[in-house]
Amino acid sequence: MWKDELCKLNGELPQGERLSRSFFTRDGLTVAKELLGKVLVHETPIGTVRGIITEVESYMGVEDKGSHTYGGRRTERSEPMFHIGGTSYVYFTYGMYHCMNIATDVEDNPQAVLIRSVVPADKESEERMPDLRLEASLASIRKRKEAKDEEVTPSEVERKKKSLLKHLADGPGKLCIAMGVNKQQNDVDMVKSKTFYVTEGVEVLPAEIQAGKRIGIDYAEEAADYLWRFFM
């Protein structure tokens, strides 16, 4: 079990080898399942953050009604999905959150995997992820307080940080904040990048992988029922 493996390492997963181009230039369903247990790495302004990927969704391109590229739609926003497998696709949604994907397969076959959830891969990431989440939350709180000519108190900061620990990076938006990911990380070649990439991680057995419906695509008709969300 992958959790047992991480426990034996005292929560300190060693740095693994970076994933090669050939890993990503396969179909999105295969890549999605094999991304589970791999480690997303981002060199942020406050230091390196590493997250073990625990939940993903596949978006299978022109024939997938849940995909941004269904029917061959090619827009400025979705352009990275048409790039070579291993290219990041980060977009802004609901006017609030970023979502991070990785393009798969060959160029001009616009498939991608949405990274939905990670857990810290080491003690430093366990400390830095809450700090990144906290800074984003405090910015919003300060704005509300300033409108009332009030200041954020130390006790409010502490309470907020504790509350963030319960659901640190278990959703696409929270994941991006905890990993320091935004539009600056869009359309990055994650095979070549020195600051934003994916490495080997923990072994995940086939029996540990569960499948379910993708979240938030009720509009996608029959595609809304595809079991293309994978988690462990």
What would you call each of these model-derived segments?
Residues 2-232:
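Conserved, well-structured core segments that form or line functional sites
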